[in-house]
């Protein structure tokens, strides 16, 4: 299903892009951007035909493309040399008697350090919790291997892929439901035996799956359940069934954090075949996100069980993509907004960049974020969120 955004939503999202990042990468990628400025009056426009950018050697190929897109969208914001002089973090040096070279830098997340990995796992946990809110039934399955099928004790993704296919067919045939998964494979802390944790969204085993109670836990005092029917579908060992509480969901979704101990990546000492594996269905939490999108954009946070979380990157990228494709915003005004605010640099550049943009309000009225945000809130009740008619037959109501 594709969704459409109205002018109120995009106006509030513009304010959302100004928020400072919730975390700080410990090993950011810092591109250096340089451009040539003619030495004339302070209000002369920079000759952007001579614009050029230099990157540090630690940039990877795919990250260079991201930086280039970000840099190419800041030209309008840095047009006037008078405002350029007001920014302390811009350095200037004479190139010759007629030109000066100005430069600035901004960090991009490395996506590999513990802070970046923690941010990604938290985003996935928030998405999984939102997906669970969209269903009446959810469950957690623990798939183990018996001694006959343990083999070399190396996780094989094909095992879980085939089981998911069998379970989808089983649930669709007997219950007529569509389900989603979030699965993490890991090795036990004591004996190192491989097993899988799986969250099933939209279904939980019932008496028809032949649930059998047994005593488990550290002291064998906890009542747990195993399913004989799911064991037949799994074929490699036992299948334990548990309730899908928020704690269980966050444990599975944020398991990736267990690999870091005092900033040390424990997976770096493992071969690729021995590393833990994680897989998830597409678009987790999407329906719940769009159902409460107005509320989330108004507070600029996602509130779950009293805790406030930032927007996962998946939702930010989706909103930016919808705005870029929607014909309603194919105007000169919104093209300018997309160019300045909805690009990669909108949420990658440091807070100093946005402080500098506020200095441009008198020169570029379109960048007056406060008035734009207040005007959007006044018309909040008159705006609706609806999908494209070509992609959805029914009415999608968010009220």
UniProtKB/Swiss-Prot annotation:
InterPro entries recorded: ORF2/G2P_dom
A GO molecular function held by the record: DNA ligase (ATP) activity
Reactions this protein catalyses: ATP + (deoxyribonucleotide)n-3'-hydroxyl + 5'-phospho-(deoxyribonucleotide)m = (deoxyribonucleotide)n+m + AMP + diphosphate
Annotated catalytic residues: 251 (o-(5'-phospho-dna)-tyrosine intermediate), 255 (o-(5'-phospho-dna)-tyrosine intermediate)
UniProt keyword annotations, A-Z: ATP-binding, Endonuclease, Hydrolase, Ligase, Nuclease, Nucleotide-binding
Keyword Flavoprotein set for record: no
Record flagged with keyword Magnesium: no
EC number: 3.1.21.-, 6.5.1.1
Role this protein plays: Plays an essential role in viral DNA replication. Binds the origin of replication and cleaves the dsDNA replicative form I (RFI) and becomes covalently bound to it via phosphotyrosine bond, generating the dsDNA replicative form II (RFII). In turn, viral DNA replication initiates at the 3'-OH of the cleavage site. After one round of rolling circle synthesis, protein ORF4 is linked to the newly synthesized ssDNA and joins the ends of the displaced strand to generate a circular single-stranded molecule ready to be packed into a virion.
Family: Belongs to the microviridae Rep protein family.
Protein name: Replication-associated protein ORF4
């Amino acid at each position: 299903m594709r969704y459409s955004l109205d002018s109120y939503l995009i106006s509030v999202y513009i304010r959302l892009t100004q928020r400072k990042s919730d975390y700080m990468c410990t090993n950011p990628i810092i591109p250096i951007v340089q451009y040539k400025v003619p030495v004339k009056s302070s209000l002369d426009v920079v000759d952007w035909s001579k614009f050029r950018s230099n990157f540090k050697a630690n940039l990877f190929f795919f990250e260079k493309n991201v930086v280039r897109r970000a840099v190419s969208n800041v030209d309008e914001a840095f047009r006037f040399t008078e405002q350029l002089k007001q920014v302390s973090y811009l350095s200037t040096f004479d190139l010759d008697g007629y030109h000066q070279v100005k430069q600035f830098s901004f960090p991009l997340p490395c996506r590999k350090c513990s802070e970046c990995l923690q941010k990604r796992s938290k985003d996935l946990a928030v998405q999984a919790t939102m997906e669970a809110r969209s269903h009446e039934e959810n469950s957690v399955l623990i798939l183990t291997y018996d001694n006959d099928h343990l083999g070399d004790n190396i996780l094989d993704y094909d095992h879980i892929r085939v089981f998911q296919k069998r379970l989808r067919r089983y649930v669709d045939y007997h219950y007529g439901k569509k389900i989603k998964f979030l699965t993490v494979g890991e090795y036990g802390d004591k004996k190192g035996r491989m097993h899988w944790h799986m969250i099933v969204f939209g279904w939980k085993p019932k008496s028809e799956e032949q649930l059998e109670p047994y005593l488990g836990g550290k002291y064998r005092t906890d009542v747990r359940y195993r399913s004989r029917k799911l064991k037949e579908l799994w074929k490699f060992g036992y299948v334990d069934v548990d309730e899908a509480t928020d704690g269980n969901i966050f444990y599975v979704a944020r398991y990736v954090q267990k690999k870091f101990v005092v900033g040390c990546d424990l997976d770096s000492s493992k071969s690729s075949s021995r590393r833990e594996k994680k897989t998830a269905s597409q678009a987790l939490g999407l329906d719940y996100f769009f159902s409460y999108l107005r509320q989330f954009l108004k507070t600029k946070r996602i509130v779950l069980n009293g805790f406030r979380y930032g927007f996962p990157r998946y939702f930010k990228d989706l909103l930016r993509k919808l705005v870029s494709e929607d014909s309603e915003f194919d105007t000169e005004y919104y093209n300018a907004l997309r160019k300045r605010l909805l690009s990669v640099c909108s949420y990658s550049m440091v807070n100093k960049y946005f402080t500098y943009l506020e200095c441009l309000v008198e020169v570029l009225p379109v960048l007056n974020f406060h008035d734009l945000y207040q005007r959007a809130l006044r018309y909040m009740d008159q705006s609706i969120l609806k999908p494209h008619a070509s992609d959805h037959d029914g009415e999608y109501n968010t009220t």
